[in-house]
Amino acid sequence: MPETTRLPRGIVSFPTDRHADARIFCLPYAGGSASIFAGWRHALPASLEVCAIELPGRGSRFAEPALTHMDAVVDELVRMVGDCPPAPFALFGHSMGAVVAAELARRLVELGRPPIALVASACAAPHLPIRREHVLHLLPRDALIEALIHLDGLPPIARERRDFLDTFMPTIRADLQCRETWRSTPHDLRIPVHVLTGADDGLVSEADALAWHAFTSTEFSIRRFDGGHFFIHSAMQAVLDHLAAIVQRSLALRHGESVAPARHACAPDHDRGMK
């Protein structure tokens, strides 16, 4: 896959220095943009290309109204991924992005274009009921900000800068509406599903993470990292080392190569599944 491959609008590529074997389409948390993945290029093997999704209402698409319904978001993503030149790809999503990634995976499987793996980070399985205290999109501004801070639902820069919050509040609210009004049902994607959690993440319990097992009859693993809900920033290199191992293993499986079996059971401490 050449590094000069032209990708459609809405996908921000952080290309490698040589031809890549696979892409990782990355979906951010609520209110996040493609820029949160910019530092991943040099922390992943050159054989993997980071393709960050830029949805309307943020980053280079800030002037466009943010989407508030999951079907509209996934329709947009199916078009974007479909316009990419053929190549093996995995889907990675953090928090709300994991829910979007799961629905995108379902749609792509139905279309006969399955990803080689789904990696769901810092997110309860999407078919679980949303706790009442986590339904936020209708709250007034100040109450919404306080609730997000209390739930550790804001990245550090947003907690430190209220002007930043005011700028992106419509996008955050739209993303929350998209997630909180969406109801999923368990469906076997028939692809590997790997879950990442934060040891101090109060938003996602162990049971919430284990429930992702309902979305695959193939490989499943859970890995816990140091940090809270935004451990992908505080434990970035450890996360990316694990992500690279997942994608490389999934490529080998897709090519029919022999690999050691991954354990499905959760182990204590940090490692809970695939080695």
Predicted regions and their residues:
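Domain-scale detector for complete catalytic domains at protein termini or as standalone homologs
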Residues: M1-F92, M96-C266, H270-K275
